[in-house]
Amino acid sequence: MVRIGVVVQRYGEDVIGGAETLSRDISERLNASGFDVTVFTTTAKDYITWKNHYKSGETILKGVVIRRFPVDVERDMDVFNTVSSSFFNPNNKKDITEEEWIDLQGPVSTKLVDTIQDEQDKFDIFIFFTYLYYTTVKTLKVLKKPSVLFPTAHEEPPINMKLMKDVFEKPDALFFLTGAEMDLVKNKFSLIGRTILSRTGVDIKRNVDESLFRRHYGIVSPFMLYAGRIEKGKGLEVLFDAFVEIRKKNMIDLVLMGKKLMDIPESDGIKYVGFVSEEDKASAFRGAVCSVQPSPMESLSITTLESFSQETPVLVNSACEVLMEHIKLSGGGLPFGNSDELIESFNTIYTSRNKRNLMGRIGFDYVKKYYSWDEVIRRISIPIREISNKKN
């Protein structure tokens, strides 16, 4: 039996985040398919402060052993943002080193790194989720065992730091969620390990009752849906501006679900529902006229795939290569570059039920073909076994 150590900054059923959810989905499915999986993570639940939330020690979730280690220091996001703004400004003199920036980024857990360094011979291979954090950068540095990395990378300042060369070039294989992500990383680094377009899996729920969400949240009018973190940097300002104009001509709502980290305009038709159950989320996607993903930087956008899985078309930011890849390969939505184009794309979908239904169906076919969990785990399992057998 192949013994796998998974390294990720946060982990748990109630932890919200793309890389974190990916790590849990893959860990549980690898464990269920015959691998022996142990997760090394921190006690943090909140990625803003890295505040210790869970108890240190060992627990088990759906058969996967979880070992949590305390975070040494909480993060002050205001200080971090100020320092980062200066650090990544090419016109400024660097007041800190790249290593010091990684420490500020966190979550710093020296006990986690030390434990893996001391106990790594108990494992055949390590899997790291996301390139960006202390837990990946520092642990890879001390690791002698085989490793693979899910970078979940997109174009952003930290990926251009010199120390990222070792992070991307040391692993024996890199697994990518999209072709755009793989191309980005290949263009930036001289990759020695294997590069594999693994994608990720989506739970395709059929026979979803689209009225369930409406009943629970009192939604009467047709609605557009945004699901994800509601924060600056996600392109929501363009969506809000466009919706004001859309609302003037159409009795339609804009429903927002997810964690609110920025102010939401007080405008007719904008409805914030917070976190919802998985059943309500599927129902919302099923019942929406369309979903909208306005973010300019995504490494996958699971919500786009969830929308397709409910046969609902998606409007996406054309500046994001990953989102454009989904649209080009599937035909399940339309792009926009600004608020005027968003309005135009929405009108194209809204005024033609036939076109909307067709986009929904071919979006579903795309997800079913490329993002079934059985196929994803097969694509991941084969190289993991081969690397483990070759290196040990």
Model-based region annotation:
Residues 326, 348, 355-369, 376-382:
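A short, well-ordered alpha-helix in the C-terminal region of glycosyltransferases
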Residues 258-283, 287-290:
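Nucleotide-activated donor-binding/catalytic signature segment of Leloir-type glycosyltransferases, i.e.
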Residues 265, 319-330, 335:
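Short acidic/histidine- and often glycine-rich active-site loop of Leloir-type glycosyltransferases
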Residues 296:
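Aromatic "clamp/platform" in nucleotide-sugar-dependent glycosyltransferases that forms part
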Residues 313-317:
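Short hydrophobic beta-strand element within catalytic cores of glycosyltransferases
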Residues 329-340, 348-353:
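Conserved acidic donor-binding segment of nucleotide-sugar-dependent glycosyltransferases
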Residues 146-157, 164-209, 219, 226:
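Donor nucleotide-sugar binding/catalytic pocket of nucleotide-sugar-dependent glycosyltransferases
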Residues 216-234, 240-244:
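Conserved donor-binding/catalytic core segment of Leloir-type glycosyltransferases
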